A protein has these predicted regions:
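A short, exposed loop/beta-hairpin motif centered on an aromatic-Gly-Thr core
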Residues: 159-169
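Intrinsic low-complexity/disordered segments
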Residues: 2-3, 23, 83, 101
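Short, cationic Gly/His-enriched loop motifs
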Residues: 40, 45, 55, 79-158
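Short helix-coil boundary/hinge micro-motifs
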Residues: 2, 12-78
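Short, surface-exposed linear segments at secondary-structure transitions and domain or protein termini
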Residues: 68-74, 92-97, 169-177
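An aromatic-rich alpha-helical recognition segment common to small helix-rich domains
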Residues: 86, 143, 152, 169-180
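Short arginine-rich
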Residues: 178-189
Length: 189
């Protein structure tokens, strides 16, 4: 297993003078003042889009769309620091960096309208999953092939609840969605 695979899901911590540790996210946020961000970028909360306010290089001109897609999200490099656009949108709208994770309520990773963003815990953010993982053979969230039928299962606070065996994956998925709406506060499906 590579170091990158081992570190996935764990915040990368950096030791600084005095023995304290900070995550790379904390260091990145502290490295740039909001005034600098506001000088360089303009955010439209209704569209969720950032534009450059001034020319920063030969490639970046005033009025150009800011950011590049990366795994469905938009990332913006400002003064040498790479920021997720949804974190910048939160900062521009609330005046503060998010305390936890920013969740896209409608599940569209590139939709950075402020009405689509919320600051939630990692657990709640994970509860807003809308699609089955790529390795799920049934193609339905919360459903596994089980003998000659399909079983639905849901997890909350580390505890798995069995939702029954069903003849079709659609019926098992319907049972999962019903339980998800009742159990998961982050659920928006």
């Amino acid at each position: 297993m590579s170091l990158r695979q081992q570190a996935r899901g764990k915040p990368c911590m950096v030791r600084i003078d005095g023995g304290t540790t900070k995550s790379k996210t904390q260091l990145r946020r502290q490295a740039i003042q909001f005034d600098q961000l506001a000088e360089a970028l303009q955010y439209n909360p209704q569209s969720g889009v950032f534009h450059w306010k001034k020319r920063l290089s030969n490639c970046i001109h005033a009025g150009d769309l800011a950011g590049n897609p990366h795994r469905g999200y938009v990332r913006i490099r400002v003064f040498g620091h790479l920021f997720p656009a949804h974190e910048l949108a939160w900062r521009f709208s609330s005046g503060e960096w998010p305390e936890q994770e920013i969740d896209h309520i409608n599940g569209i990773k590139s939709d950075n309208r402020i009405c689509n963003l919320r600051d939630v815990s990692h657990a709640v953010n994970g509860q807003n999953q809308r699609k089955a993982r790529r390795d799920n053979k049934t193609g339905f969230l919360g459903v596994i092939a089980y003998g000659d039928g399909y079983a639905a299962k849901i997890m909350k606070n580390g505890k798995t609840t069995y939702l029954g065996k069903h003849r079709t994956p659609e019926k098992a998925h319907a049972a999962y969605v019903k339980a998800k709406r009742a159990l998961h506060e982050g659920c928006s499906i």
